[in-house]
Amino acid sequence: VALTILGLSGALSHDPSAALYIDGKLVAAAEEERFVRDKHAKNRMPYESAKFCLEQAGIKPSDVDVVAIPFAPISLFGKARWHYAKRYWYAPDRALDAILMGNRRYKRYRNKIVFCLEQLGFDPKKIKIEPVEHHLAHASSAYHCSGFKEKTAILGIDGKGEYATTFFGYGENGKITKLKEFFDPDSLGGLYGAITEFLGFEMLDGEFKVMGMAPYGDASKYDFSRLASFENGELVINTEYANVIGLRRYKENGKGFYFSPKLIEWLGPKREGDIADEPYIHYAASMQALFEKLSLQMIDYYLGDILKETGKLAFAGGCALNVKLNQKIIARPDVKELFVQPASGDAGTAVGAAAYVSHARGVPVEKMEHVYLGPAYSNEDVIAACARHPGNPAWRKINNTPENIAKIMVDGNPVAWFQGRMEFGPRALGGRSIIGCPSSSGVADRINEQIKFRERWRPFCPSMLDTVAPQMIKVDHPAPFMTFTFEVAEEWKTRVPEVVHEDGTSRAQVLKREYNPRYYDMMKALEVLTGNGVSLNTSLNRRGEPMVCSPTDALNMFFGSDLQYLIMEDILVVKEGAPTYESLD
C-alpha cells in the first residue's frame, strides 16, 4: 500500500501551500495565493492548493495516510519560551503569555487545519495530523530534497517559527540532528525585515528590493554593527532598535513597525517613494553586509567542521532566498555544493513537513530536480478560456512553438510564456514567465513599460542553456532554481546586457533539457538566431499580484497590461494593432 502524505503550511498566517508525497515521490505542490489570486494569501488556509494536489494525483481524502503540518507544540522545559519571556520583559503581557499559554498559536492553527480538511471532505474522526517543528520542516525541505548522500550541514534562517529563528544541524543517512537554535527576538531575518520596513518596503517582498538596492550603496559609510552581534556562539539582536513589539514600536498613522523610534533618531526618517537615493542606498548596503558577515560567522562556528569533512550544505528558510549571501557561501573553500530549497519561504514547509514524516515512517523522498509541480493545461483548455474571455482574444494555433516564439523575441518583443505545469516557489522558471531576448537593447525597459512597472534599479534575470553556463558564469555548480547569483564573464556582459545587475552579477537559472524541453528548445532557437543561448526571464504577473496559474489568469493579466504577445501551449494570442507574424504558420 502506498504511503500518502499531504503536507500543509500556513501556520504563520502567510504563504499557505500544499504538497503531496506518494511513496517518496513529490507528485504535486502549489501555493494557495495562485488559486485565490491574493499575494501571500494572508490569513487563509491551503484549501484550493490541497484540493489541487488531491485532484492531480487522482486520489480521495480517505487515501491520505497522514497530514503533516510545519508547526508544533513547544515544551516549557526547553529554552525557547523562557528566552522569549526574558528578552521581551518590556512587554510583560506577551512575556507571560509565552510562559503560561505558549502554544496558543499552535492550537489555533491546528483547529483551522482540521476545519480546512473537513471542508475538503476528510473525516474528522479519521484525520491523522502529525506536527513537525517549523525549523525542522525547513531543515527537511533543504536536506531531504537535496539528494546529498554524505553527511550534510543544514542551515535554516528565517523570521521565526514557533519561537526559533535560526537552525543549525546536520543530516546523516536521512536523519536530522539539531546542533543549535536561536530564538525570537534574536532573528537575523527579523532584523532584515525591520530594516526593509524602514527602507519603505513591506516585509516578505521588500527584502528582495533591499538586496537589489544594496549594490548601489557603499556599506562602509554607515556602521550597522550596533544592530546585531555574534559572540561566543550566541546571536544577539539589539532590541533597542529592531525586532520590537508593543510600546517599543515606531508608529505612523496607526500602523506599528518592527523597529523603534530610536532607529529613526539614529538614521533619520523612513524612506518613501520609488527612488533609490542617499542615504538609503547606503543603509541597504550596510544591512546586506551585516547580514552576510553574521551569517558567514555563524556558519563557520556551528557548521565549519562538517563542511570541512564533506563540503555539502543544505539551506532553507526565507533568508535562503538571499542570493547574494548564497554567492558568498559557494565561494567558501570549504563548500563543495550548496543546495537551497527553491521554495525556501514558508510555502516550502509543506514539502518539508511531509518529507520529514515520510522519512520518519521509513520512506525516503527523492531528490528535488525541478519545481514544475502545479497545474498544467491543454490546448483545448486554453482555447476554451479564450472563447469565454470578455477581452475577445485574437488567437491561433501555431506549429514549432519554441522556434517561432524565438523569432518574435529577436525583434525585441517581450512574450508572456505559459507552458506545462506551474512552478512551486517564488521563481518563474519557464512555466509561467515573461521572456525577452537579452541581447535586444531596451527589452527590460519594454517589460517595465508594458507590465512590470518595476523600480529601475531592480535587475531582471537570465535563464540559460546548460551548455552556455560554463562560458557565461564560469562555474560548474548546479543552479536549476535561480537561488544563486554569479559573476558574469566580461565578454558576456556586453552580449546580454539586459540581464546583468549593477554589480556585474546575474541570478541565473541553468537548465537541463529533460526538465523543461520546450523552454530549452526556445533558448536553443535564440542561440541559432543571436549566438546567445540565454533568455531574460521574469515571473508572469502584474506588480503586486501572484504569478499566473490558469489560462484565464493569463488572459486577465494580458488584457490588464500592454503586453503584445501571449503564448499558451501552442495557442498564440496577439494584441490588436501588434504585428501578427502571419508568416510563422
Model segments located where?
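Short, Gly/Pro- and small/polar-rich lid/capping loops
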Residues: 1-5, 395-397
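N-terminal cofactor/phosphate-binding cores enriched in small/glycine residues
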Residues: 5-77
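Phosphate/ATP-binding catalytic cores across multiple sugar-kinase/actin-like superfamilies
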Residues: 285-311
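Flexible beta->alpha loop and helix N-cap segments adjacent to enzyme active/binding sites
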Residues: 10-31, 36-39, 83, 90-94, ...
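Short glycine-rich phosphate-binding loop at a beta-alpha junction
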Residues: 60-72, 128-130, 307-318, 416
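Short acidic-aromatic active-site loops that bind/stabilize oxyanions
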Residues: 99-107, 129-132, 273, 277-293, ...
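Conserved hydrophobic/aromatic pocket- or pore-lining residues that grip, position, or stack substrates
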Residues: 195, 295, 318
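Short beta-strand-loop/turn "lid" adjacent to the catalytic site in phosphate-handling enzymes
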Residues: 56, 60-114, 140-141
